[in-house]
Structures are given as C-alpha cells and as structure tokens.
Amino acid sequence: MLSTLSALYGHLAESGVIPANPAALNRSRLGLGARDASPTIRLTAAQVAALLTAAARPTVRGRYARLHATRSVAYVALLTLGLRVSEITGLDRGDRYRTGGDDVLRVLGKGGLHREVYVTELVREALSDYLAERDRLAGTANPVRRGRSGTGASPLLATRAGARCSRIDLYTQLRRIAADAGPALDGVAERVHPHALRHAYVTIALEHDAPIQHVRADVGHATIATTQHYDRGLRRRSASAADVVAKALDLYKS
C-alpha cells in the first residue's frame, strides 16, 4: 500500500502538482544507508502491448461499458506516442487534424511550446472508436478549429459527464489496467505509471534503430530546441519514430 501511495505522490511531485513526495522515506532519519534513486521501470514492447489488450476489456456493465473500454484504449494508445500525461489531459478535439496528408496532434509541452506529434494507425483507430462512441451516447461540443481555443473547447479525453479528465483520473485508470494485464506485468504492475510508457517509447524506438534526433523531437525534449527552430518547416513523418514504436508493439498484439 505504501509503495502505491509513494508512486502516486512521486508522479504528482514530478508533474509539479505537489511540491514533494510526502510518502518518500527519509533514509537518514531511519538510519538507512544512501542509495541511488529508483529508476523508472523499463517496459518492453510486449508489456506495453499487454496494457493495450487489458485496456480493451470491459470493466463496467450496461450502457457505458463500451465508452469506458474505448476510452481506456485511447488513453494507453496516446501514451504509446511518448506523450506526458499533462500533455494528454490538455488535448482538445480540435488539436487533432491532418497536415501534409498525415494525422497529427498539436501538443502543448513544457515551457508553453507546441509541437506536432504524428498519429499512428493504432492511435487513429483508438481515438476514432472512442470519439464515435462518446458522440453516440451523449454528443459533444463541435471541435474547435486549428489554432483556436477557449471555454468551448471539447477535451479529447473526457469523463462520462463530459469534463476534462485529470491527471489523477488517468493515473488511477492506468494502475487499474496494469493490474488486469496478467502475467506480462507480474511483479511490476504496481510500478506502472504514465511516465513509464513515455520512457518505453524512447527505449523501444532506440532499440529499433530510430535516429535519436527523431525520438527527441517526438517527445519534446528541451535539448533539441535549437534544432527544432531550424528544422520545424522541414519536419515530415519520416522524421518521427512513432511508426517504429507502433510496428514493434504490433508484434505482440493479440
């Protein structure tokens, strides 16, 4: 129980929601020796695929069963793009559009900087299924046009009542999915959190020989800000690792 709370508070502290992790152990006060910080869990492509499979399993019955399942799949699918959870919760329906013949998401990253993230077929199908079910049940506000925002914007991921999902909502949802993922996540399910999938995006991409500069551009690391300034107009789908990661995950989909 303590490890679960510590992981939750650790994620909130990392995201800037709270100043520090109140569940972290004070090792010196307890007379324990110093140790290296526990690294982010390293998920394999097979484990990420298991999360996608588990997300599709209905967890509620009745009218909203398909809505919950499709939203869970859409959420995990978005995480396979290497997005931060804060970037996912900030997405509006109008942030999804086509450019140069490709589906993209306009993501607001750290420092208030936007970047375009290429949408894989996995993510496109997951979002289409979820949004179609959401619209069928209750309808939503019309998507805002590209570059526009305001109080009328419709969140890409929403609660059943139509409100924007919070980071805690999605964190809790991912923990539930991980717990249902079966043997593939044995021993690590309690340590799965959104940043672990962002980390997995980077490691899977690099393991499959994606150019590191493409990976850094995909995830919005600050260290490539200068490169992006000069390369923004030339960036194409071929300069993204998204399809590399999607192909790796496809090998393990059931």
Cite the ranges covered by each PLM segment.
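Conserved catalytic core of the tyrosine transesterase superfamily
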Residues: 1-254
